[in-house]
Amino acid sequence: MANNKSSKKRVQIAERNRLENKSYKSAMRTLMKRCFSACSHYSQQPGETAKANVKASIDSAFSKIDKAVKRGVLHRNTAAHQKSRLSAAVKQAIEPAPST
């Protein structure tokens, strides 16, 4: 437990930052899930509106991930990994591999 005033304040600040980071990560994960679900919806029912939905969802997810790195919530390599997963899912949905 903290013994002096400055360390008590640091504990409070760390808890505040933890909660802010938690909500930011949660919002980021939600946008990623929306992107994955938009991809699966497009795979089942392709169309221009579904394709626009996929594009909009990946753009918003990428934006949130980049802002998380900028704010120090995520490490840049973790962000790159998440963006790579999203890109691969979108590519797979829009341009499926030819079956041979």
Swiss-Prot record:
InterPro entries linked: Ribosomal_bS20, Ribosomal_bS20_sf
GO molecular function: small ribosomal subunit rRNA binding; structural constituent of ribosome
Annotated NCBIfam families: S20
Region spans: Disordered: 79-100
One GO BP annotation of this record: translation
Highest rank taxon of the organism: Bacteria
Coiled coil: none
Protein name: Small ribosomal subunit protein bS20
HAMAP family xrefs: Ribosomal_bS20
